[in-house]
C-alpha cells in the first residue's frame, strides 16, 4: 500500500489522514482519450475523473514553494501547502506515469499541490473568514440602509449647484489649461532666451579672457617701457649733470693748460725752453711749439682772425709756418738739436714769424671796450719780448747770438701772454 506524508503549511505539523482522504489524495492515472479503459487497467470502479477534478479544484491557492526550514508559521502564507511525502511503489504503470508527470510539474513550478489543514489551522482560517464575512455584511447593510433612507439621493437644486460647480470647474480647468499653455510658451521662450544668454555669456567669457591676455601683454610692455623710461631718465639725469659740470669747465683752459715751472714755461705738460742746468729734450720743446701753434690758431679762429703774411700749420712736434707770398717757403717750428742750433737762422725766422702772428692776434683782440691787454709787449721787427710792467727789459726770441737763459725767458713771457689770452677769450666767447 502506498505511503504519503503531508505537513500542515501553517504550523508544519505532520497530518494524519483518514483512509478516504488518503485514497483521494493519490494521483490518478490519466483517462484514455477514447473514454474506455485500456486493457489490463486495474483501477477501482469508484475512482473517476470527477475525483481528479475535485482534487485539482482543492489545489487553488496552493504554492509549490517549500515551507521554512525552522518550522515557524508565516502569516502571509497561512493558506499555502506543499506536498513533501514520497510516493511508494505503485502497482499500475499508468499511476506511476501520472505520479512522475505530477512530480515534474511540481518541480518545474507549473502545478500546485494541495493537502488538508490541521484542525487548529482550519479553525483559525474559519475565524478569519467569519470576520471578513461579518465586515462585508455590515457594509452591505449600511449601503442598503442608505438606499432606503435616500441619503445618497440628491435634490434638483443640489444637482444644479453641482452642475454649475462642474461648469465653473471646467471653465477653471480651461483657464488653467490656457495658463499652462502660456506658461509652456513662456518656458520655451525663456529657454531660448536662456540659451541665447548662455551663448552670449560664453562669448563674453571668451572676450574677457582675450581682454585679460591683451591686458597682460600690455602690462608687460608697460613695465618694460617703464624700465626703459627709468633708464633713459637716469641717462638724461647723468647727461644733465655732465652738462652742468661741463658748463662750468672752460674748454680753452681745459684744453690748454699753461703754467710756470721755475724759469721755464709749460704748456700741456711740455716745457718750452732749456737751461744749462735743466736739460730739456728737443723733442719736448718741438711738441711744446706744436701746442703753442695750435693754441694761437684756435684763438685766431675764435675771434675770426685771418693771419697775414703767414699761414700757421700745427702738426705736433713738426709744426711750421708757410709764407703766403711764397708757397715754397716753410719755416719750421722744430729743431733736432746739435752744436749749430743757435746758428740756425731758419728756426729763428720761424719763431719771429710766430711772434708776428701773435702780434696780429693781439692787435685784433685789443679792439673794443673789452679789449685784450697783455702783460708783455711784442716787438716783431727785432723779435723781442718786452717786460712792460717791470724794468722794461727785452728778451730776444731768436737763438742766434743769444743765451739759453734769455731765450727761455722770452719763451716764458710768450706763454704768459697766451695764458692771459685764454682767459680773455674764455670770458668773452665761451657760451
Swiss-Prot record:
One Pfam family, short name: APG6_N
GO molecular function: phosphatidylinositol 3-kinase binding; protein-containing complex binding; protein-macromolecule adaptor activity
Statement: the UniProt record of this protein carries the keyword Cytoplasm: yes
Effect upon mutating residue 215 to L: Decreases interaction with ATG14. Increases slightly homodimerization
Matching InterPro entries: Atg6/Beclin, Atg6/Beclin_C_sf, Atg6/beclin_CC, Atg6_BARA
Alphabetical keyword list: Autophagy, Coiled coil, Cytoplasm
Start and end residues of each stretch annotated as Disordered: 17-74
Recorded GO CC terms: phagophore assembly site; phosphatidylinositol 3-kinase complex, class III, type I; phosphatidylinositol 3-kinase complex, class III, type II
Reported impact of residue 222 to L: Decreases homodimerization. Decreases interaction with ATG14
Phenotype when changing residue 187 to L: Increases strongly homodimerization. Decreases interaction with ATG14
Domain of life: Eukaryota
Residues spanning the signal sequence: none
Subcellular location: Cytoplasm
Tissue-by-tissue expression: Present in fetal and adult brain (at protein level).
Regions annotated as coiled coil: 125-248
One annotated GO biological process: late endosome to vacuole transport
Region (Required for homodimer formation): 173-243
Subunit structure: Homodimer (via coiled-coil domain). Interacts (via coiled-coil domain) with ATG14 (via coiled-coil domain); this interaction is tighter than BECN2 self-association. Interacts with AMBRA1, UVRAG and PIK3C3/VPS34; these interactions are not disrupted by starvation. Does not interact with RUBCN. Interacts (via N-terminus) with GPRASP1/GASP1; the interaction is direct.
Family under the similarity heading: Belongs to the beclin family.
Function description: Involved in 2 distinct lysosomal degradation pathways: acts as a regulator of autophagy and as a regulator of G-protein coupled receptors turnover. Regulates degradation in lysosomes of a variety of G-protein coupled receptors via its interaction with GPRASP1/GASP1.
Name of this chain's protein: Beclin-2
Species: Homo sapiens (Human)
Gene this protein is translated from: BECN2
Amino acid at each position: 500500500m502506498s505511503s504519503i506524508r503531508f505537513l500542515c503549511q501553517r504550523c508544519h505539523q505532520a497530518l494524519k489522514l483518514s483512509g478516504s482522504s488518503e485514497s483521494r489524495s493519490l494521483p490518478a492515472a490519466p483517462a484514455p482519450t477514447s473514454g474506455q479503459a485500456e486493457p489490463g487497467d486495474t483501477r477501482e470502479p469508484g475512482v473517476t475523473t470527477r475525483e481528479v477534478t475535485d482534487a485539482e479544484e482543492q489545489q487553488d491557492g496552493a504554492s509549490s514553494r517549500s515551507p521554512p526550514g525552522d518550522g515557524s508559521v508565516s502569516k502571509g502564507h497561512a493558506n499555502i501547502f506543499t506536498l513533501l511525502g514520497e510516493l511508494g511503489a505503485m502497482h499500475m504503470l499508468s499511476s506511476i506515469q501520472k505520479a512522475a508527470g505530477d512530480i515534474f510539474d511540481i518541480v518545474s513550478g507549473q502545478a500546485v499541490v494541495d493537502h488538508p489543514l490541521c484542525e487548529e489551522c482550519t479553525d483559525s482560517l474559519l475565524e478569519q473568514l467569519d470576520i471578513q464575512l461579518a465586515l462585508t455584511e455590515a457594509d452591505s447593510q449600511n449601503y442598503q440602509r442608505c438606499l432606503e433612507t435616500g441619503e445618497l439621493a440628491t435634490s434638483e437644486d443640489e444637482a444644479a449647484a453641482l452642475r454649475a460647480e462642474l461648469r465653473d470647474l471646467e471653465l477653471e480647468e480651461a483657464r488653467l489649461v490656457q495658463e499652462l499653455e502660456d506658461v509652456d510658451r513662456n518656458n520655451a521662450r525663456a529657454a531660448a532666451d536662456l540659451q541665447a544668454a548662455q551663448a552670449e555669456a560664453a562669448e563674453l567669457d571668451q572676450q574677457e579672457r582675450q581682454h585679460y591676455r591683451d591686458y597682460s601683454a600690455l602690462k608687460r610692455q608697460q613695465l618694460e617701457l617703464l624700465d626703459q623710461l627709468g633708464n633713459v631718465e637716469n641717462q638724461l639725469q647723468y647727461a644733465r649733470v655732465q652738462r652742468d659740470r661741463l658748463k662750468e669747465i672752460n674748454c680753452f683752459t681745459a684744453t690748454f693748460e699753461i703754467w710756470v715751472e721755475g724759469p721755464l714755461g709749460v704748456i700741456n705738460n711740455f716745457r718750452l725752453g732749456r737751461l744749462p742746468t735743466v736739460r730739456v729734450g728737443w723733442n719736448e720743446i718741438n711738441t711744446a711749439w706744436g701746442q703753442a701753434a695750435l693754441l694761437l690758431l684756435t684763438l685766431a679762429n675764435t675771434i675770426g682772425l685771418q693771419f697775414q703774411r703767414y699761414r700757421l700749420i700745427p702738426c705736433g712736434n713738426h709744426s711750421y709756418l708757410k709764407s703766403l707770398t711764397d708757397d715754397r717757403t716753410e719755416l719750421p717750428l722744430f729743431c733736432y738739436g746739435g752744436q749749430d742750433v743757435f746758428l740756425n737762422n731758419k728756426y729763428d725766422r720761424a719763431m719771429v714769424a710766430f711772434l708776428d702772428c701773435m702780434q696780429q692776434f693781439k692787435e685784433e683782440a685789443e679792439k673794443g671796450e673789452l679789449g685784450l691787454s697783455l702783460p708783455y709787449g711784442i716787438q716783431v721787427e727785432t723779435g723781442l719780448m718786452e717786460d712792460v710792467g717791470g724794468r722794461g727789459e727785452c728778451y730776444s726770441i731768436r737763438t742766434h747770438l743769444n743765451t739759453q737763459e734769455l731765450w727761455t725767458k722770452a719763451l716764458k713771457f710768450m706763454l704768459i701772454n697766451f695764458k692771459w689770452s685764454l682767459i680773455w677769450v674764455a670770458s668773452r666767447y665761451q657760451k
